């Protein structure tokens, strides 16, 4: 993932604006996410870039994505970009489950230099 391609992703606000499925559920879960002051301080102490690959119809994305989006809201040094799986095969194909499956959601965490530091790909059977 290059910095230039990462920058082409949607912000969470832009993602929410284009949602046709599950928008209300996403917003409810985001609002219901409870964060402690320790949670907020931990994320503010980091300089991260977070890549999310999803689709609005994906129920599995409703499990972790709203909470993560809420967590980074108040973190000025954390940048999250969202890519729709079906519209961005070049991005999706870099993060295939077991090198074969276009499983979503995908969350990839980078440091400020775009070095990958962590990755989560949905674990349900493909």
Feature roles, as predicted:
Residues 65-69:
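Histidine-anchored nucleotide/phosphate-binding helix
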Residues 60, 90-91:
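Short acidic/glycine-rich loop or secondary-structure boundary segments that cap or lie
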Residues 49-55:
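Short glycine-rich or small-residue beta-strand-to-loop segments that form or flank ligand, phosphate
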Residues 56, 86-88:
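Short, solvent-exposed coil/turn elements at secondary-structure transition points
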Residues 1-49, 70-79, 85, 92-103, ...:
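Non-globular targeting/processing and membrane-anchoring segments
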Residues 56-63:
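Conserved redox-active cysteine motifs that mediate thiol-disulfide chemistry
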